């Protein structure tokens, strides 16, 4: 079976977890891992898996893109450098899956809007944030039943699972997640809060989703919609679980979720890594299937 060759930029927690998932993919083949520190654990791990590596950043990858047939690149670095990375790789006809909160391209939350991206030939799609991937499906589950005036999400993650890149991007995280709660989740106004909990042993990712509906909530239809959406997310993140809810209080609908990871890189408490990397892999696989079927040809983008 033909596989689409991929590069990963950023060998941190997210990049390393994503590499494990891509190694299992039937349509994606990771061939390059890009970093900036030759001694980094992520680059060493990639080398051990037989992946080509460079410690010279994206510039170290560019000369090899065409020779090695790289067609999709995953950026798991930082919002600050994503624009430059995307510009350089798009110019060579490489599609970008953006796992930073840069959000240059349109937001993608697979169970909600993955199919919409298919015919649009986008060269850059943004995976929002781990908090966004865990909570926006629940906001969308309510908003597809009736209008949501306000959606607020609180993502609680273990300190150990949050690397230096994510810490530098906290403001971007909250802005990008709130924007996607509105654009993808369907809330008229969105707000996002992230809590990084230093408890030891590390706690599992927990997410609280509040929605204020414009009219009295249709409790039965909302509950059915939420359970159906949870099943959709579980197709690619089996550890996505309803802890409590939906709880109805006047026009407020609250859902409490927990996300366990597969333990590919960090232990299972780091569900925040899994929900992000599994969503990114799922998105890339859909585009790869279209490429293999001959329905999608990537074109260089001149910035």
From Swiss-Prot:
Enzyme active site: 130 (acyl-thioester intermediate)
Pfam short name (any one): AcetDehyd-dimer
Keywords (A to Z) from UniProt: Aromatic hydrocarbons catabolism, NAD, Oxidoreductase
SMART domains recorded: Semialdhyde_dh
Ligand binding (NAD(+)): 161-169, 272
Entry GO MF terms: acetaldehyde dehydrogenase (acetylating) activity; NAD binding
InterPro entries: Acetaldehyde_dehydrogenase (IPR003361), Acetylaldehyde_DH_C (IPR015426), NAD(P)-bd_dom_sf (IPR036291), Semialdehyde_DH_NAD-bd (IPR000534)
Catalytic reactions on record: acetaldehyde + NAD(+) + CoA = acetyl-CoA + NADH + H(+)
Entry EC number(s): 1.2.1.10
Family as reported in the entry's similarity comment: Belongs to the acetaldehyde dehydrogenase family.
Name of the featured protein: Acetaldehyde dehydrogenase 1
Species for this entry: Cupriavidus metallidurans (strain ATCC 43123 / DSM 2839 / NBRC 102507 / CH34) (Ralstonia metallidurans)
Taxonomic classification: Bacteria, Pseudomonadati, Pseudomonadota, Betaproteobacteria, Burkholderiales
């Amino acid at each position: 079976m033909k596989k689409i060759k991929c590069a990963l930029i950023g060998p941190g927690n997210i990049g390393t977890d994503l590499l494990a998932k891509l190694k299992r993919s039937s349509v994606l083949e990771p061939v390059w891992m890009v970093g900036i520190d030759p001694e980094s654990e992520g680059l060493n791990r990639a080398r051990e898996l037989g992946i080509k590596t460079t410690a010279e950043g994206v510039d170290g990858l560019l000369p090899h893109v065409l020779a090695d047939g790289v067609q999709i690149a995953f950026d798991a670095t930082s919002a600050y450098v994503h624009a430059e990375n995307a510009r350089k790789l798009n110019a060579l006809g490489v599609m970008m899956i953006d796992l930073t909160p840069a959000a240059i391209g349109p937001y993608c939350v697979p169970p909600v809007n993955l199919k919409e991206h298919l015919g649009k030939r986008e060269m850059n799609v943004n995976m929002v944030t781990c908090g966004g991937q865990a909570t926006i499906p629940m906001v969308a589950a309510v908003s597809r039943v009736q209008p949501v005036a306000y959606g607020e999400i609180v993502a609680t993650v273990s300190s150990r699972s949050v690397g230096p890149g994510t810490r530098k991007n906290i403001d971007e995280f909250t802005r990008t997640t709130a924007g996607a709660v509105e654009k993808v989740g369907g809330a008229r106004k969105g707000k996002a809060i992230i809590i990084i909990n230093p408890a030891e042993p590390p706690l599992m990712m927990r997410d609280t989703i509040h929605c204020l509906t414009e009219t009295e909530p249709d409790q039965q239809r909302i509950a059915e919609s939420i359970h159906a959406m949870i099943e959709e997310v579980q197709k690619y993140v089996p550890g996505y679980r309803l802890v409590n809810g939906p709880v109805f209080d006047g026009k407020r609908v609250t859902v409490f979720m927990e996300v366990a990871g597969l333990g590919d890189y960090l232990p299972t408490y780091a569900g925040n890594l899994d929900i992000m990397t599994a969503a990114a892999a799922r998105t890339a696989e859909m585009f790869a299937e279209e490429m293999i079927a001959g329905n999608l040809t990537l074109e260089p983008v001149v910035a």
